[in-house]
């Protein structure tokens, strides 16, 4: 399919089976997925600000009417893409860890995979980290929800012993996620997305330091 958005490299949201289906066999859910894929390709190629609804529907191979069956506007589509990408990121994190290793190694593996996935496309990454915040409260809510999912995953890995102590509480996990996000945002601002792998060591060290500090505080309890 010809498109003004070009061919870009990013982690797909479509399964190969769905991507190969003819238009007549595509159900409503797949139309939604195609629109998200179209949005992702266009944003990755030309940025969010320069992407139009016409670009999205052309890339998705659907009508403008179909777009408005799912989204009220372009910001709504970006929020949906952000949520889908967040779920994809969680899948990347889960598939990266080796359950036979300790939590320190598991988390480091997950962080490396996460940052590696982000670095695949700097423009799309900027939209999901920066442009989403320009959408006001709905964008902030979507970002907060994604951060909470990452924090929950982090706690799941660190606190994996059912009968063991709680090594990482909720507030501290969110603080670590916030710190990692700030490192990523700094890399975006400084045009160092290609070097995101350099953040694996400090991000992992931050988590270890927080866990160590939390265990050293007498009477520290979940709030």
Feature-to-residue mapping (PLM):
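Amphipathic C-terminal alpha-helical segment
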Residues: 117, 156, 170-194, 206-220
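Short, structured motif recognition centered on aromatic/hydrophobic residues
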Residues: 89, 127-128, 180
């Amino acid at each position: 399919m010809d498109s003004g958005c070009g061919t870009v490299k990013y982690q797909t949201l479509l399964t190969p089976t769905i991507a190969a289906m003819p238009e007549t066999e595509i159900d409503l859910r797949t139309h939604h997925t195609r629109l998200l894929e179209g949005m992702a390709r266009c944003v990755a190629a030309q940025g969010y600000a320069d992407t139009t609804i016409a670009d999205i529907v052309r890339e998705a191979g659907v009508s403008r009417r179909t777009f408005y069956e799912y989204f009220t506007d372009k910001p709504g589509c970006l929020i949906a893409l952000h949520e889908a990408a967040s779920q994809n990121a969680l899948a990347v994190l889960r598939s990266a860890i080796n359950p036979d290793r300790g939590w320190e190694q598991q988390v480091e593996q997950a962080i490396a995979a996460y940052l590696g996935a982000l670095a695949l496309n700097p423009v799309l990454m900027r939209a999901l980290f920066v442009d989403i915040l320009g959408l006001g409260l709905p964008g902030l809510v979507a970002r907060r929800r994604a951060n909470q999912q990452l924090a929950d995953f982090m706690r799941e890995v660190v606190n994996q012993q059912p009968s063991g102590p709680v090594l990482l509480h909720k507030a501290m996990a969110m603080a670590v996620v916030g710190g990692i996000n700030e490192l990523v945002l700094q890399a975006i601002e400084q045009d160092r997305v290609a070097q995101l792998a350099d953040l694996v060591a400090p991000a992992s060290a931050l988590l270890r330091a927080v866990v160590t500090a939390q265990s050293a505080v007498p009477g520290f309890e979940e709030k």
